[in-house]
């Protein structure tokens, strides 16, 4: 019989399913502490005179940011109940960011105001469900009013204004985004990347560019820059690896006969096939180059199909194409006006594909983007779409340090999203004025019952909070500013917190995209009013640690000496 000595081993029973439960006002109050903590941290960034927040990171330098959603995401509270409240408001910021790309700080401020007032009304005996209904009905009325005061954005100047506001008054960024949209269109692909200089730059990548270069340096035609450059080239596409000589000889003969350069893009080119290509290039002077197809799996298959449609080439090795590569004809080869290949990337310019087929492919990819739920997938689909249409605009963000570039990239990404939103649904006066002006729509609104009217009053109070926060961050008393703004009949009259004066917000270029304000209000009211209807909060009790460390427990292993007594 095996007997283990237990000396030194002390265990604690761990009930992983143990929960802690709080009801009513106690649970809501605990969550409200978390809501307030997160909202306080986020609201300091609001407006032109908002402050920065420094966030400790588990790796690298601390992050300095004025981006609301970044601040919200960084907050994780020790107290479980407080953390639940904070996480729900985080969701509001995330949702606003996903839908409109901006307005996260505004959404957070609104959510806190609605949750706080909602909790108080319920504490005083209001019906939570009816109050929520009143909040949602009031929000519908306000959204309709926002659409009424909204103006369309059409000119490059207006686009630059929107981008400048979202980039915290950075006119360079505003003009850069406006130029990018001018070049690739308002629905074109614009990406934001780290630059390699101190200045911000705009680069337009036309045609089909992908990150795969020549397979062998022996294909180089231009010593300067170690590039392969050809004009009026033929394109051979293959989904499969090309290794045999007989696979490429017919294509080489065709290219030679037509006196045109040949670009081979395949899964890989190696063995005898690669040797033959290199020898023909060096000894005969044949204009040829081989490139590995970009991506993997379905991504590679789709990219090759895009190339085939853009250049008019047949894809060999494709399941739908039964023709063998050795039976190639001139009609199976695609055409491009220019091709430039370095060791790292390839650029195909002005493919000669059928325009009708290209448009069909663009429609197909657009449908896929609409149906996709993955951000990564959407990004890849947008890149493919851009390569088939107007190209990709790349905003290269410069700066003196990694921290500076990171902070600027956050602002540029926000500005880009806000600008797209403005083009989509128009603009309203900025600085919290649009929401304040929407109060007039609720002036004569009568709710179905007393509790719903409480919900309407909660929204009325919340609508004053964004402008109040902006003014407070500028170091002024909000009530006098709000009275001055509401006392003027001009709907675009508001307060310029940056320069400390009252102006016509549209004329001064202080504007917000309608979509940003609308989504901020809808997301905030939805989550915050639901939070107010909470009657029970359940959290996990942290697991107890085993008493005595692993080293102490090992002392009991001395009993293993009894193993000698085991008989079989």
From Swiss-Prot:
It is found in: Mitochondrion matrix. Pfam families: Cpn60_TCP1 (PF00118). Induction: By mitochondrial stress. Keywords: ATP-binding, Chaperone, Mitochondrion, Nucleotide-binding, Transit peptide. Implicated in mitochondrial protein import and macromolecular assembly. May facilitate the correct folding of imported proteins. May also prevent misfolding and promote the refolding and proper assembly of unfolded polypeptides generated under stress conditions in the mitochondrial matrix. NCBIfam families: GroEL (TIGR02348), PRK00013.1 (NF000592), PRK12849.1 (NF009487), PRK12850.1 (NF009488), PRK12851.1 (NF009489). This is Chaperonin homolog Hsp-60, mitochondrial. The gene is hsp-60.
